[in-house]
Amino acid sequence: MRRSIRNLAENVEKCPYSPTSSPNTPPRTFSEIPGPREIPVIGNIGYFKYAVKSDAKTIENYNQHLEEMYKKYGKIVKENLGFGRKYVVHIFDPADVQTVLAADGKTPFIVPLQETTQKYREMKGMNPGLGNLNGPEWYRLRSSVQHAMMRPQSVQTYLPFSQIVSNDLVCHVADQQKRFGLVDMQKVAGRWSLESAGQILFEKSLGSLGNRSEWADGLIELNKKIFQLSAKMRLGLPIFRLFSTPSWRKMVDLEDQFYSEVDRLMDDALDKLKVNDSDSKDMRFASYLINRKELNRRDVKVILLSMFSDGLSTTAPMLIYNLYNLATHPEALKEIQKEIKEDPASSKLTFLRACIKETFRMFPIGTEVSRVTQKNLILSGYEVPAGTAVDINTNVLMRHEVLFSDSPREFKPQRWLEKSKEVHPFAYLPFGFGPRMCAGRRFAEQDLLTSLAKLCGNYDIRHRGDPITQIYETLLLPRGDCTFEFKKL
């Protein structure tokens, strides 16, 4: 990890961004960090607006609230969350990002993305999951999956299954186009993500792109409602911490329904698998896990549940965002089709990869990468003590006018192919960084590349309806019309 930070840091001076303070300037105190005006107990006025007006319209614009704070206060902003919650420091400077991540250590600490899910699982006597754990227990579970999930050569083992799902997706899109004249990718992308999870995690087809699409839609809708309610409870008054509120009871009901379905899938898969004394390097994921001697069945289910719910929530929106960018930029789609036609068997697909990378930049799936500092730091010339929650606001960084000076709000995949245009290495972090980088990153990239190549190679794609933007529902999800037209080439 430290070597990767050094490698990235070598390019920092080439990038058009100046440091925010001189090393000779004495640091200012934590209390001097700018931010919205505080009210005792309540906290910051800006944040309190979300606590009082915790309706859907207000919550959906939380990402805009973060952008407005950056424009008003600058590269570092402090918010008092109020009602017994601690401060959070928002940073928008890649130099500060580098400082925070370089101090990660072996086990970086984070603020759980979904406190409600953490509370639910602990209440049920379950492990909170990879995304909600910190310390030695997180490190133990994460280390167990590192080989199978983060090494490119290991992920290649799953390519045949990704290809099966991409072929099913092409057939499903053709069926939807024929039946309805247009394709609702909000539904189809979710089914695709669920089917991919079945092949990778449960080692079987779930029928999500076939005769079980209605069952798949129900599970996807449950997951969506959990994320929507989680966002409302995260930004609202945290009364559920003390009392069983109507929102909390609704959350428990949703989680119960979701977990019962996924638990059945996990048990069905694990009951059919056997411990094998042979080399585990070529095993599929669940088989690999049960053959890890340091993992018991409970550990395996925790990992599978984390991977399943995280993948369902992130990969499907990214397929929609990629299709939208290609459908609204036909010249890019034609370039991909040319690339595929010239070498159908190639897996390089350089331009398609650049388009996917640009889509991650334009449509980041999250508002931030979080950390809890484990040592005292100096950020933008201010003292930030150990134990402070710090949000690296990737949503702002990846569309920054200085960091991406060449039309940051426009879709320009060529920017990733032009070596002359250096990008600050800590400005682009769609999967996080270091030991807590998204565990499913390489699976997601492989699934997107394989399925987009199949769709682009078979169809001319057009978007129909209002433009797609983003709303905040714990993650940044599509807002607008996700209807597409697929014409056979």
Swiss-Prot record:
The keyword Metal-binding applies. Residues 16-29 have a biased composition (Low complexity). The keyword Transmembrane does not apply. Its cofactor is heme. One of its GO terms (molecular function) is monooxygenase activity. Keywords: Heme, Iron, Metal-binding, Monooxygenase, Oxidoreductase. Residues 12-31 are annotated as: Disordered. Its EC number is 1.14.-.-. Gene3D superfamilies: Cytochrome P450. It comes from the Eukaryota. Heme binds at residue 438. InterPro entries: CYP11_CYP27_families, Cyt_P450, Cyt_P450_CS, Cyt_P450_E_grp-I, Cyt_P450_sf. Belongs to the cytochrome P450 family. PANTHER family: CYTOCHROME P450. Cytochromes P450 are a group of heme-thiolate monooxygenases. They oxidize a variety of structurally unrelated compounds, including steroids, fatty acids, and xenobiotics. This is Probable cytochrome P450 CYP44. It comes from Caenorhabditis elegans.
